[in-house]
Structures are given as C-alpha cells and as structure tokens.
C-alpha cells in the first residue's frame, strides 16, 4: 500500500473535485496513456492501469468515501475496508467512452444501441394566413398539407403484394451484427447495425413498385382546422397525430400550424384591446359631435364632448378581441386626431379672423399656460 500514489494525485485533481471534473481528467489521461496510442511503451501501460484504478475508486461514491477515510487500506478487499477494492473489471460507464474513441461503435455490449423499435412519425410545420376579423372571432380553415402516408398497395410493409419477405441471414433477424476485436485488455465485442438489412432484420426480395419498398408515399392531404377566437399573430395550433405516420407501429407525428394575421387598414391590436384612430374637424372638436366609429361588430355612434383635444382617447368597453381562453372581450380605444383644413375660402378666413379677435387666450388654456411659463423662464 505504501508504494501506491494518492488517487487524486494520479488524476491531477483536487480532493473536492466533482464527478464531472473526475471524469474529464480521467478521459484526458486515459487517451494520453492508452496502449494503442503508445504501442510497446511499458511505462505508458503502467500509467494507464494506474489511471483506471484511481478512477474506478473515485468514481464510485461509496468507494471514494472509504478511500477518503482510510486511504488505500479502505479499498483493499483483504483489509477492514471490506469488498469493493480495485479489480481488473473496468467501470463500463467511464472506459466505454474511451473505447468508443479508439474502436468506434460501442466496445461493451451493455452500452450498444438496440435494434430500432417503434418510432414516432416526423412532426410537420405549416403556416397559414388569416384576416384580422378571423383572428378575432375564429374560423374553420381547410389547409393542404404535404405529408407521408402509409402505402395502400403494400400496407406499409414495403414488399410487393404476394412476394416473400425473408429473415436476414447476416443478423438472424436481430438487425445487429457483432464484431470481435482483440485488445491488450482482452476481447471486446462491438455491436453495430446490420448493413445487409439496415437494422430491419428482414430482407425484401421484391420491393413494392408503388413506394419503391419504403412502405410510405408522400401525398397532399386536406385537413380542417378550427382556429379559435382571440388567436394572435405568431401563435401556433397543434394537432396531435396530424404529422407523418409512425414507423413499426409507432405513433403519428404532430402537425403544428403557425398563424399569421394580416394587418387591418383601421385597427391595430394591443393584447386583447383594439386601437382605432378617427379624424375629426376642428369645429367638431370645439363644439362636440356625434361620430360614426368603426368596430369589429360594425359601426357604432359615439359623441365626443366639446373641447376635445387632438390625441384624446375614448374607450368603447367590450368592443375588443375575445379572450383566447376565457369569457369576455377586451376594449376598443378610439384615438381622436383633429384635422386642420389646408385650404380655406375668403369667407372662412374672415370668420376665423373674427373668431381669433374675440376669443383671446382665455379660451385656449394650454396656449395661455405655455406662454405664462415661457415668460417666467426668461425673466
């Protein structure tokens, strides 16, 4: 025991090193000293064994705890540490990754990929455009989706109807073959997908002419979707099972429909509220007026009070967008913009001049306040 180096020193890590730090150090050293990288180098081989021994202990929480308490004696199967010391068996969870690097595939059977079983079909993404009103109140839409369908001729088998499907004699129907490799540490078995049957375990002697042996065909299918009221631009509707069919009995993929909403010439959307800008004349603003205001439900009458200022906003309760998941609707906000005429006839100009002479500043509170502040600022 006295000749053994400290395991943490062997791996070049601190005693408080995390599992990830241990694994990283181990991988780097194992690659550095691996016998296949250093053929005939007995020093490198000894280092490699030392690194594996250190990692075998420190990667196991119970063994590491005994080592931290009792040192090498705690890992000696003949000492008071009990069973669990170093043996020639490697920790497959760690060294298996190293052998993948040098030999490819999976050197240990327990980590090999199994033959492919049922697989979910591919998901399909689709985009459709709807109007502002359709987004507000919902709509049923029929879309044409390009998707894979099970071949009706061979019912998905890929074989010509009436032909024979034989078991692959390369893998005996397992879909996998094993390759034995001799290494300085013994014989390792690498499991890989059978090239002859591509992992299917069967050989189709006469492929289906309709689908070229694939068992599926691409086609365009009409699908009806219900777009709910209140949906917003950029939101997605999912239809479970609306995607491509599964493989080997697996479930169908899903269909995801992205909704794009066309801009409206009058309305803009803010959450579940609708904003509309309405132009009025300066006489309507000054005297007040009954206006026809467009809403999603049609035109409604609304009276703006006298003295309305440009930029004033009025609320029409419950005239907005329906809530997507719940009752009720948002509101509509009407923003008033006062339009000043660009052309006036002589009579109109004369009347306005007369109005200006008799109005004074008392009827223009904002203007009067502004000039009062300006006088104070430049005293």
UniProtKB/Swiss-Prot annotation:
Q: How is the cofactor bound?
A: Binds 2 Zn(2+) ions per monomer.
Ranges: CXXCXGXG motif repeats: 151-158, 168-175, 194-201, 208-215
Please give the chief subcellular localization of this protein.
Answer: cytoplasm
Keyword set for this entry?
Chaperone, Cytoplasm, DNA replication, Metal-binding, Repeat, Stress response, Zinc, Zinc-finger
| One GO molecular-function entry | ATP binding
Q: How does it assemble?
A: Homodimer.
What job does the chain carry out? Participates actively in the response to hyperosmotic and heat shock by preventing the aggregation of stress-denatured proteins and by disaggregating proteins, also in an autonomous, DnaK-independent fashion. Unfolded proteins bind initially to DnaJ; upon interaction with the DnaJ-bound protein, DnaK hydrolyzes its bound ATP, resulting in the formation of a stable complex. GrpE releases ADP from DnaK; ATP binding to DnaK triggers the release of the substrate protein, thus completing the reaction cycle.
Q: Which family does it belong to?
A: Belongs to the DnaJ family.
Q: What is this protein called?
A: Chaperone protein DnaJ
């Amino acid at each position: 025991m006295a000749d053994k180096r400290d395991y943490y020193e062997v791996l070049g890590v601190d005693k408080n090193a995390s599992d990830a730090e241990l694994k990283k150090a181990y991988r780097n050293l194992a690659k550095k000293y691996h016998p296949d990288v250093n053929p005939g180098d007995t020093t490198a081989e000894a280092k490699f064994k030392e690194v594996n021994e250190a990692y075998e202990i420190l990667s196991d929480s119970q063994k590491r705890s005994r080592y931290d308490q009792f040192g090498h004696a705690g890992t000696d199967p003949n000492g008071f540490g009990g069973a669990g010391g170093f043996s020639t068996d490697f920790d497959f969870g760690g060294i298996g990754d190293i052998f993948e690097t040098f030999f490819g595939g999976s050197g240990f059977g327990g980590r090999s990929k199994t033959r492919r079983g049922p697989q979910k079909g591919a998901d399909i993404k689709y985009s459709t455009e709807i109007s502002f009103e359709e987004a507000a109140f919902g709509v049923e839409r029929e879309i044409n989706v390009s998707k894979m369908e099970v071949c009706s001729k061979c019912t998905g088998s890929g074989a010509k109807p009436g032909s024979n499907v034989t078991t692959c004699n390369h893998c005996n129907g397992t879909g996998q073959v094993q390759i034995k490799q001799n290494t300085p540490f013994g014989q390792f078995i690498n499991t890989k997908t059978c090239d002859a049957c591509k992992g299917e375990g069967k050989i189709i002697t006469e492929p289906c002419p309709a689908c070229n042996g694939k068992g599926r065909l691409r086609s365009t299918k009409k699908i009806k979707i219900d777009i709910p009221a209140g949906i917003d631009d950029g939101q997605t509707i999912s239809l479970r099972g609306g995607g491509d069919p599964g493989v080997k009995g697996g479930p169908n993929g899903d269909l995801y429909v992205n909704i794009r909403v066309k801009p409206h010439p009058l309305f803009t959307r803010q959450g579940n509220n609708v904003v509309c800008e309405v132009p009025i004349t300066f006489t309507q603003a000054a005297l007040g007026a009954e206006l026809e205001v467009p809403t999603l439900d049609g035109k409604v009458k609304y009276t703006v009070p006298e003295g309305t200022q440009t930029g004033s906003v009025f609320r029409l309760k419950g005239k907005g967008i329906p809530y997507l998941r719940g009752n009720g609707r948002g509101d509509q906000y009407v923003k008033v913009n006062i339009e000043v005429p660009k052309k006036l006839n002589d009579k109109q100009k004369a009347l306005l001049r007369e109005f200006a002479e008799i109005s004074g500043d008392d009827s223009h509170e904002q203007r009067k306040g502004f000039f009062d502040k300006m006088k104070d600022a430049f005293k």
